[in-house]
Amino acid sequence: LWADTRKEGHYGLQYKSTPYRVGPSSGNGVGVTLTMVEMFYSKNGLPIDLDPEYDYTGRYRYGEYHNDVCDGVTMNLNIDREPRFYAWVAFQNGYYEVLRRDGADDNANIVQTRFRKNDVFGIKERTTNYTPTGYLNKKGCSPLYNNIQEDVAAPHYPWPVIRMAELYLNLAEAYANLGRIDEAAAALKPVRERAGLDPVDEAFEKAGLTLGRDEMIRMAR
């Protein structure tokens, strides 16, 4: 609904978020916090501490992560999450979509991310250009960033200041505070559909959970 059209500077979000030395300009420093990582839903569209199918107590243990382009050992916290998690967060043995070579092979433009101390994107002996959390931000970073050419500016696009989704979420929270749960769920539906999630009332019903006022307020926030 409202966007900031000013161009991003060289040391902006895209530079600071992309993996270290994948291309000519990448800072490797904007680390998603653990609190934010845990706020993303499970693959069933529920908070991970509410989903009976999600191993919440074992989330800090290790497991095998597999997808079409890369795999490896990672924390269980990074497995069986919702689509937005994988679109917005890079994690140990996950992937980052950046343009790093010529050619039509989509997999050639995907970097497997490894953040342990001596891994390719780990801290090693550096004092800067590393993620302090073991995660990197992908949200707001164009897959066309980090071309192999030198001195390529970050792809320019209008930065969303006020999103339509924010209005839906505000409306859902207002309905929830009034105890109008059905209307709150209806307001959330377009946001969840766009994110590839079932409607909130269906997700709770499938899990055998009760969707009350407090739960709906939490989902809207």
Language-model-derived ranges and their functions:
Residues 31-37, 91:
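Helix N-cap / beta->alpha transition motif
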